[in-house]
C-alpha cells in the first residue's frame, strides 16, 4: 500500500470522526455555521492584533512594523500561491462531495464550494501566515493566534467536510513557511523601508490603502474575487 493511499485512508477516517458531532447539539451546529459564514470571528481578531501591535509604543517598534508589513505582503502572495496550486494541481473533491463517507451537514450551511478544489486550504494558508507573523513579534500573542487559527478557522472546516486534514495541514504549512521565509529575503528591507517612509510622508494614502488590504483580508478577498470574476466573464464575452 502506497503512502498516498495510506494518507487518503487516514484523511477519510479523521474527517468522518470529526463530523460525527454534527447535529448532536443544535447550539453547537449554529456556532460552527457562524464560524464558517461570518467574517468577524475568523480573521478579524488576528487583524485587530496586528493593528494593536502596529500602534502600541515599543522600543523595537520599527522592526515590529517591518514584520507586520511582511505579513501583509506575504498574505496576498500566499493566497495567490494557494489559488494557483488549487488550479494547477489535479482537482480534489471536497469531503462533503464524497457521498460514500456519509457526512452530515448542518441544515443552514451553504455547500456552494463543491466545485472548488479542496487542496490546499486557502483559509489555512492565510490564517497561518498571520499567526506565525504575530508569533515572530510576540510569543504570547503568537501562541494565541496559532490556537485561534487552528480552533476557529481550520477545525470547523474539517468538522463539516469542507476540507480533509491534509488540505488544512498543507495550507497551514505553506502559510507558516512563507511567514518564516519573509525575513530571509534580501529585498525585504528595501520594500518595507519604502513602505515605512511612505507611511511617514503620505499617511493618508498609506493608511487608506492599509485599511483596504486589511478589510479584504478579513473577508478572504471575496469582494476582489467577485469583481475579478465579473471582469473575466465580461472580457470573455467581448472577445467572443
Predicted regions and their residues:
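N-terminal transmembrane-helix/juxtamembrane module of multi-pass inner/ER membrane proteins
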Residues: 1-47, 82-112, 222-240
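N-terminal signal-anchor transmembrane alpha helix
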Residues: 1-4, 69-89, 210-220
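Membrane-helix interfacial "entry" motifs
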Residues: 22, 26-30, 59-63, 67, ...
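Membrane-interface alpha-helices at helix entry/exit sites of multi-pass transporters
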Residues: 30-33, 63, 142-146
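Hydrophobic alpha-helical transmembrane segments
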Residues: 36-55, 123-130
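Interfacial segments of alpha-helical transmembrane regions
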Residues: 50-82
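Membrane-embedded catalytic cores of phosphoryl/pyrophosphoryl-handling enzymes
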Residues: 107-232
Amino acid at each position: 500500500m502506497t503512502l498516498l493511499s495510506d494518507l487518503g485512508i487516514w484523511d477519510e477516517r479523521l474527517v468522518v470522526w470529526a463530523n460525527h458531532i454534527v447535529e448532536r447539539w443544535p447550539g453547537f451546529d449554529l456556532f460552527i455555521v457562524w464560524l464558517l459564514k461570518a467574517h468577524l470571528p475568523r480573521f478579524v481578531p488576528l487583524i485587530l492584533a496586528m493593528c494593536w501591535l502596529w500602534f502600541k509604543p515599543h522600543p523595537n517598534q520599527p522592526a515590529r512594523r517591518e514584520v507586520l508589513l511582511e505579513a501583509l505582503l506575504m498574505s496576498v502572495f500566499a493566497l495567490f500561491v494557494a489559488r494557483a496550486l488549487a488550479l494547477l494541481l489535479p482537482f480534489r473533491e471536497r469531503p462533503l462531495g464524497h457521498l460514500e463517507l456519509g457526512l452530515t451537514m448542518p441544515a443552514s450551511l451553504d455547500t456552494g464550494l463543491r466545485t472548488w478544489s479542496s487542496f490546499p486550504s486557502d483559509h489555512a494558508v492565510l490564517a497561518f501566515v498571520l499567526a506565525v507573523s504575530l508569533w515572530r513579534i510576540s510569543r504570547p500573542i503568537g501562541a494565541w493566534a496559532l490556537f485561534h487559527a487552528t480552533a476557529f478557522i481550520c477545525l470547523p472546516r474539517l468538522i463539516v467536510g469542507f476540507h480533509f486534514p491534509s488540505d488544512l495541514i498543507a495550507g497551514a504549512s505553506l502559510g507558516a513557511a512563507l511567514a518564516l521565509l519573509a525575513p530571509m529575503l534580501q529585498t525585504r528591507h528595501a520594500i518595507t523601508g519604502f513602505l515605512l517612509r511612505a507611511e511617514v510622508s503620505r499617511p493618508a494614502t498609506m493608511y487608506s490603502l492599509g485599511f483596504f488590504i486589511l478589510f479584504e483580508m478579513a473577508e478572504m478577498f471575496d469582494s476582489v474575487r467577485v469583481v475579478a470574476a465579473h471582469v473575466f466573464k465580461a472580457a470573455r464575452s467581448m472577445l467572443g
